[in-house]
Amino acid sequence: MKEEELLNLAQEAGFEAAVLPADRVPTDGKFRAFCEENRCGQYGANFSCPPTCGSPEQMRDKTLAKQTALVLKTTWPIANYQDTVAILHGKQTHNRKMLRLNESLGGLCAGGSCCCLCIPCRMKTGESCPYPDLRFSCMSAYCIDVAELCKRCGMTFAWDETLLSVYSMILL
């Protein structure tokens, strides 16, 4: 699919979007530390999260196995960064829109947060994942430097106390 077609599909789905060659997606193993801090509570408790999802090197290899990165962004109003209900809503809505878009693309998703196909993840109950081909890891699990990614594809990257920006990508 041509770049213009990808951008049009993404914009029709409600995303700000950009396209970048997959080998230009910046990764750095130091970003795995964000997962290891376990602020989201999913480290070792979600099939899509570290350490289960793979090492930083394995995640980089998944990125390099693809040709194109369709980078996606949505923004959501929040009261502040303690507004966990609005933040969760923004991230989950973004990820669901990403999955719907990917139904027609068949790519590999890196979400704005961890996989949300099952809440809670079946890993927490000792069951196997019912969606191994659909589950997705987050940008941090892929060790993506999102600020640099935005710079490379011309997107604005900024923190705002009252506006949540959620980033993801579909690798094709």
Predicted regions and their residues:
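Auxiliary alpha/beta "docking" domains used to position bulky ligands
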Residues: 1-172
